[in-house]
């Protein structure tokens, strides 16, 4: 049936868990339609930035000092001392909430991703769409992205990226919080600690341990 063919294998592959261990909202995110509309989302206005996301992020940050490759704590220690405790009125923290508190209550769990790129100089069109998802459990990747279709590229050759779900460990990039019963209970304990941090706002997928779409 539809669930077995399109939902079960893909979901368990992405999350590394049996569907019965996952919250219902994960399944409810999958739209079921009886129309020929092939858009995943139903927002009235949809699109991607001309020139890609790098350009729009650069414009958003224009004139704002940005430091990369520096740990949050070392940055705060460098800029905020006992003699000058109020350098920042508020700090927006979008990293992992358990890492912020040095994992003192235990580790929250996340899913990570691994990307595999391939350039095909003799292939002008690999799959005909920007993104194709693979729902079969036995296929190790969840989707293939063909980049030229995002902006109607017409150049010779094509580049594809295969996206593989992966277990997360410290040092890996955390992409998705795993909102099962155990993790939600632990997050609530961390949230109680966060409420005592008067100068810090916790936001984003990692700071609020919640699956947000990027437009949220």
Located regions from the model:
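Mid-domain catalytic core of redox enzymes
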Residues: 73-193
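Short FAD-binding loop at a beta-strand-to-alpha-helix junction that anchors the flavin cofactor
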Residues: 195-210
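An active-site-proximal "capping" alpha-helix that borders the catalytic cofactor pocket
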Residues: 215-216
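Active-site/ligand-binding neighborhood in enzyme catalytic cores
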Residues: 1-90
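Active-site-proximal flexible loops/turns
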Residues: 78, 211-212
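Conserved beta-strand termini and adjacent loop/short-helix elements that scaffold enzyme active sites
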Residues: 69-71, 147, 203
